[in-house]
Regions:
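Substrate/ligand-engaging "lid" and interaction regions
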Residues: 1-528
Length: 528
């Protein structure tokens, strides 16, 4: 069973279907020909998340029979992804959905019609220019990671031969401008707040620099800033797509599926002919298009206003997901866990995040209307966290914690104060912040040293708790005031807000001795 056999009209469909593989229900070659002649969608970034989510959404739309064109992928970072994960398999791939029950679902993704290298030095560049000059093009989307939106002075100075992703895209947009000021929408689908604005800022920076250097006209800059021609809508995307999983590979081998080789490129991209991803997914998109909108709602995309996209992001980051993740990360490191899916089976941990989410944070949640916050938390706790295929660790989530506490917990505390709500309702959030001081000590609940995860303020903050020792009675906890007064870390001065004594009491309990983290956590969640 190989992917390329699916392009043979005489392949044995029953063999695949009997083993649980969902096959395309559309004419692959007809879609490819139509897309080549009249492309509507090009996507930059050919990584795992693209195949698992945007390409799969379009695959669903094609399967519905209500759409007839595919997506062209262009890789901006790693040419080997095209050479090793697309070309040998005729741009077909296998999506394996990882369910929290431990089972999998298998679907052939055939919506990708071309795979190109976005490199001005290579022959694919001419095809990319042709695509951008075609009036039918509606959407250029991106999953290039948050780092992909970076640029620097050196690349700006390279003129119309840039090396960074946004410079390349701006050069292609210049071709579209010269073809008749044709409209197009640029859609970031990367997991970062206000992603469309990041994309817009980068494109504008290149165009304005080129205009200043006399390489393009100011009319090109005006074209990019004309929202009747070019838009940069925001989106909120959420779907975990880990590296190819060994258990998945074994399950596919047992089926007789032969395209299961791991691929690691010279640039350390990890991929395979199959892509495995969690079953849960969200894509909320600002409905702001200039040349028509692709019917991705057929695949489950929710179109809405920019304000609502922002509310969904705020709901996730301040209440329904990120704070719970950080609470698990801090206590997970202290309690010796190295896998999130194992940690969520701990009754005290589960109770901690349930009560933080439903009882303490929910009274001030930003409700976007388009998603239900209670249901979102329920799916997160009951389906996403226990998923045995997810390799996420407390140690990874604990990275850069000092940069996250203000938004993940400080915002909730500030809303309580601003709205005059009863601050005594906040019990477990202060406990998590107190546990952060214990975490900074770098000694787990068994008394064994551990290395806190990388953080730009780690050395500075560890020095602030250095006077404290585990198991020492009658020690002076006054050093905590300097830490918990840091507005840059917590979003507010917790002592000034009246939480100082409460946090000190929790820290004292957590530092009491071996096993005190477990004892304190259990006591707090049971009392709550």
């Amino acid at each position: 069973m190989r992917l390329t056999t699916l392009l043979n009209s005489h392949y044995n469909a029953a063999e695949w279907e009997n083993k649980g593989y969902e096959l395309p229900r559309f004419d692959i070659q007809a879609v490819r020909q139509k897309t080549f002649e009249e492309p509507t969608w090009i996507h930059f970034g050919g990584g795992n998340i693209f195949r698992a989510f945007p390409a799969a959404l379009l695959n669903d739309a094609l399967n519905s029979g209500k759409y007839d064109r595919g997506v062209i992928v262009a890789e901006t970072f790693d040419d080997e992804v095209i050479d090793k994960a697309y070309t040998p398999y005729d741009n077909l791939s296998l999506l394996v959905s990882l369910k929290s029950t431990g089972k999998i679902e298998k679907k052939i993704i055939a919506s990708v019609t071309e795979a190109l290298k976005a490199n001005p030095q290579l022959s694919d560049w001419k095809r990319l220019i042709d695509i951008f000059c075609n009036p039918t093009l509606q959407l250029a989307s991106f999953t290039i990671t948050e780092k992909g939106y970076n640029f620097n002075e050196d690349d700006l100075a390279r003129g119309l031969n840039p090396q960074f992703a946004l410079g390349k895209v701006t050069a292609l947009l210049h071709a579209r401008y010269k073809a008749g000021r044709l409209p197009v929408t640029l859609q970031s689908m990367d997991n970062c707040s206000h992603n469309g604005s990041k994309l817009q800022a980068g494109v504008f920076a290149y165009a304005e620099r080129w205009a200043k250097d006399g390489l393009v006209s100011m009319e090109f800059v005006d074209y990019l800033k004309d929202e009747s021609k070019v838009t940069f809508p925001w989106s909120m995307i959420d779907k975990i797509t880990p590296r190819p999983h060994a258990k998945v590979k074994a399950l596919l081998e047992a089926d007789g599926f032969e395209d299961n080789d791991y691929i690691e490129t010279a640039r350390h991209t990890f991929t395979a002919p199959f892509v495995n991803a969690e079953e849960t997914q969200y894509l909320i998109v600002e409905d702001h298009y200039t040349n028509g909108r692709l019917p991705l709602d057929l695949g489950g995309v929710l179109f809405t206003s920019r304000e609502t996209v922002d509310k969904v992001e705020t709901m996730k980051v301040t209440t329904c997901l990120n704070p719970l993740h950080t609470a698990m990360a801090i206590f997970g490191c202290l309690l010796g866990y190295d896998l999130i899916s194992a940690e969520i089976a701990d009754p005290d941990i589960r109770s901690l995040i349930q009560k933080i989410g439903y009882i303490e944070a929910m009274p001030v949640v930003v409700d976007p209307g388009i998603l239900n916050p209670y249901e979102f938390i329920g799916v997160f706790i009951n389906k996403r966290l226990p998923n045995p295929f997810m390799p996420d660790t407390p140690q990874r989530i604990a990275m850069d914690t000092s940069q996250k506490l203000a938004i993940r917990f400080g915002e909730t505390i500030k809303k309580y104060i601003k709205r005059g709500l009863d601050k005594s309702n906040l019990v477990l959030i202060p406990l998590v912040l107190a546990a952060y001081a214990r975490y900074l000590k770098g000694i787990d609940d068994e008394g064994k040293p551990f290395n806190p995860s990388p953080d730009p303020l780690l050395n500075e903050l560890q020095a602030m708790v250095s006077p404290l020792e585990i198991g020492h009675e009658n020690q002076d906890f006054s050093c905590l005031k300097a830490l918990f007064s840091r507005e840059d870390i917590f979003g507010l001065d917790l002592y000034e807000a009246g939480f100082g004594p409460q946090i000190e009491a929790a820290v004292k309990a957590l530092f009491a001795g071996k096993g005190s983290v477990r004892t304190t956590l259990h006591r707090y969640v049971m009392a709550r």
